Amino acid sequence: MHMIYRLTKIDGDYATLIEEKSGEELFIALALLPLGVDIGTKLLYENFEFSIV
């Protein structure tokens, strides 16, 4: 199963993601996200890893 998130906020070493379908918020370390992410980036979460859409 895969989910699509949008990065909405960066606060120090952490990011806030919003899941597109449910609107659920996720607070995650930037180190777990791909290089080059910024506010507004769409991310695919699949097989326990994030990739830029």
Each predicted region: which residue ranges?
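Unusually extended, aromatic-enriched hydrophobic runs near protein termini
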Residues: 8, 46-47
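Short aromatic-glycine-enriched beta-strand elements
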Residues: 13-16
